[in-house]
Amino acid sequence: MKKGLWVGLLMTIMLPIKAQKAVIEESVTDIVCDGPTHVIAHYKEIVTVLNPQGASLANFACSCSNKDKLTSFKGQVTDANGRIIRKLKESELQKYELSKHLAVDDYTMFLDYTPPVYPVTITYEWTIDSRDDLITFPRFCPQTDYNVSVKKASYRLKAPKSMTILHAQQNIANEVNIDKSSKYTQLLTLEANDLPILEKKTYSHPLREKMPMALFAPADFTYYDTQGSQRSWKDFGLWQYNLIQGLDILPENVRQQLHQLTDTMKTDREKVEALYRHLGKTTRYVAILLGIGGWKPATATSVYKSGFGDCKGLTNYMRAMLKEVGIASNYTLISTTNHRFMKDYTCAGQMNHAILQVPLPKDTLWLECTNPRLPMGYVHEDIAGHDAIEISEQGGRLVRLPIYADSTNLMRSTVNIHLSQDGTANLKVSQETFNRQYENRIPMAKMNEKERQKILPRIVYAPLTEIKSIDFSENGAKITMETEIKSQKYANQTGQRLFVPICPLHHGYTVPNDAAEREEDIWLEMGYLNEDDITLTIPNGYTIEACPKNISIEQPFASFSFSLHRDDKTIHIKNRLLMRSGMFAKSLFPSLAEFLQSINNIYNQRIILKKI
């Protein structure tokens, strides 16, 4: 059963709210496996939706294919008194193909239901019959959203006694019970009852790491006409390596073109970069998760002919092109959502993406083949620091991708402010963003002029602004924004004084107010460094009456400094904020709130200029 097969209520993650929005009254997953290639899974979900915030939990969705068929479905809706409002039939389901472009037969069966009243209870029952692609069993994941409690959830897996079943779990108190008293079958069961709601807290781990979940997989499996093992990453990698053999054949005209492109280049790195650019110019990505459409990539020839592919196909195509010019590379499986694979569980169902590893003499490159717009070898935020499985002739090997140091996720800003006597100001801003902050700036760099002008006020806080120019340039993992603006009321004028903001770049930070209730440790997923260099030219006829004092704050999770230097005509300000990624004790949460409030206080201060 494929990694990408997900069934059940479509639980879209909502914006955080304190009120509970739904109750999972009962969740039943009942699986019968009668051999290495056949599984029947029966599901029952009863959910009470309490208010409109939980409306999306009333929807139904399951992914299917020619090998994973929905064989039965029924549902009903009842009101608070138990009266049946409506029966839901299989004929109401809508079918959505996952891709019209790729040679996959996967599709989604979907029912979009909006409750007429609240509270309302929805019951769904359905069965999936799966054949020939049993790499993992359906997972047990009874709680997949914030502010939803669970009364009763159960998982039952019946399989041949001769089959070795591997399993792993997180955030579930009960252990898997294994009953082998029957002569021919074994029964694995697991329950999770009376689960309180998961609340979204600031500076805490993401939902995926808090959810109760258990994974199950056969140690040895049959996938179509292949056999494989998941007893170790090495074994799993050997199966995946054999699966992709013979898929790297390129047409003769393509081979000649690649040699014309690279034969005169002196280094392998130059060749990799040339082919990476070629990939970006000649192909297009179609978003299909690993496991959906199978584990086998499309052939390099088919990707060349069609001009598009999913992560598997594009990665294999790049691998084939590198092989043609004599450069070895390794197909690599990774998760874009989970940083770590489950401990001692060396099975599929934990990765959803394919990338390419290129080991060079002095460096190892990681190529994101679905987005060649990124600089070659740039490790983006969805994979940086994540576990991955490198696939080679020797089998699979657990590796961990590099992650950029906090201080290299840099935003460096230079601001020149020419202030007039009436409080108007001309501002010239040059802002360089690197690595993770570079990624955050990519969407704006791709916008047209009109769209950029709508976004700029969120970056430069200057009232009544006239944008004179805004330009972007890109060099590797660096985007530079240059803008010139005029603010009609940059400084507030009161009598003989001008009250001037000390920094037009930062509007302040949201200060958490739940420090007293903190139960979780602090988790800062992304560290970064902001450096501001601001020069304010004082208008003629004014002198400095008051300025904020220099300050420096040091905490385990961050550091901040503000310094101001002055002379007769100019004020020079420097801000430096370093946020450190990682886990910090919950006892530091009041200090974090105080730290953020201190920064806000500094940014909200004013320089006071007095008319001479």
Question: What is each of the regions a protein language model found here?
Answer:
Residues 1-21:
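Bacterial Sec-dependent N-terminal signal peptides
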